[in-house]
Amino acid sequence: MYSSQASALPSRVIGLISGTSVDGIDAALVEITGTELDLKVELLAGKTYPYPAELRERILAVCAGEAISMLELADMDDAIALAFAQAAQNIQIGYQPVNLIGSHGQTVYHRPPKEAGVGKKTLGYTLQLGRGEMIAYLTGITTVSNFRVADIAVGGHGAPLVPRVDAFLLSHPHESRCIQNLGGIGNLAYIPARTDGWLSQIRGWDTGPSNSLLDLAVERLTAGAKTYDEDGQWAASGTPCYPLVEKWLTHEYFHLSPPKSTGRELFGVAYLNQCFQDAEPYQLSPADMLATLTELTVASIVHSYRTFLPQMPQRVFLCGGGSRNLYLKQRLQLALETIPVLTTDEAGVSADFKEAIAFAVLAHWRQLGIPGNLPTATGAPQEVLLGEIHQG
């Protein structure tokens, strides 16, 4: 149980996350009041702290399946925790005291649960590096970390975890909405209008690849000189190859019914290599290849909406790094026709730091004893408290 009196007091919380794009650590310092329907979050500061190049390369190699020793894994865990702690120390300058840190860490492995016969299920597994104990010690601030494992332990996917936060920050009394995150992997939260029973009707799942494939392709096409396509300008100069998009959409993941989750294990370097191999007969230019990969992201999102949502949303709000990709946004708007495609900035929540904000809120809820998962999104049979608390 939680104290309503304590929850009414403002709390300054830092949210930290590095997503599947491995661009760096997104840090958001927020002031939180309330809990759920009365939840109010003010962003005081937000910044992305790039990983050191050598550490980023090590993380990407592990995410791609490269085998490492336990010693190397331990060293990477410590290096990531140190980077997260430094981000927390930097973002709070001028805003002390800070009450709490919510640190997602860096996902290096994710395995969804699997059906193993009638009435049987093999539990999923997830590993986020950057241990909370070390962050709490280095910053002196109580830290909540390891958010996903509790949902997985009861049979859920441990993802997506953000839909419950989206529900209370971005829902509307009369309008159904999709909050579409365009990180390394795309994921959605479908939020119906706030009518009776609306919370039980929220849905969420990973739609498929987003920035991860595009960024990997840019690095490949430029021999590492560039890590992303700014504003999607390069892709915008190309022409999508629709037969390729149709071929790629036959991948079993896109036709798997939710709840579902994925990551670089499925849509990483090996998948991109196959995409390039598939494209060889078409003799695509680099711009055409990027345009076609962009179209895959768009097509997978629209396919998800039309196939698995109870109804199409009245508005779509984008967040994450891909929300700044103007070409991707334009293509998605074209595909969704009359449904307005906006960014969460236009609903009062930073599109750049929404995920970091969400983990600040999840940490706030954990400290107050409020469940953070939505079973309709993660597939868990019950609500659970998310995260492990490490005293600062």
Swiss-Prot record:
PANTHER family: ANHYDRO-N-ACETYLMURAMIC ACID KINASE (PTHR30605:SF0). Pathway: Amino-sugar metabolism; 1,6-anhydro-N-acetylmuramate degradation; Cell wall biogenesis; peptidoglycan recycling. Its EC number is 2.7.1.170. It is an enzyme of class 2 (transferase). Gene3D superfamilies: 3.30.420.40. The keyword ATP-binding applies. ATP binds at G19, T20, S21, V22, D23, G24, I25, D26. GO terms for biological process: 1,6-anhydro-N-acetyl-beta-muramic acid catabolic process; amino sugar metabolic process; peptidoglycan turnover. This is Anhydro-N-acetylmuramic acid kinase. Keywords: ATP-binding, Carbohydrate metabolism, Kinase, Nucleotide-binding, Transferase. Catalyzes the specific phosphorylation of 1,6-anhydro-N-acetylmuramic acid (anhMurNAc) with the simultaneous cleavage of the 1,6-anhydro ring, generating MurNAc-6-P. Is required for the utilization of anhMurNAc either imported from the medium or derived from its own cell wall murein, and thus plays a role in cell wall recycling. InterPro entries: Anhydro_N_Ac-Mur_kinase, ATPase_NBD. Belongs to the anhydro-N-acetylmuramic acid kinase family. One of its GO terms (molecular function) is kinase activity. It catalyses: 1,6-anhydro-N-acetyl-beta-muramate + ATP + H2O = N-acetyl-D-muramate 6-phosphate + ADP + H(+).
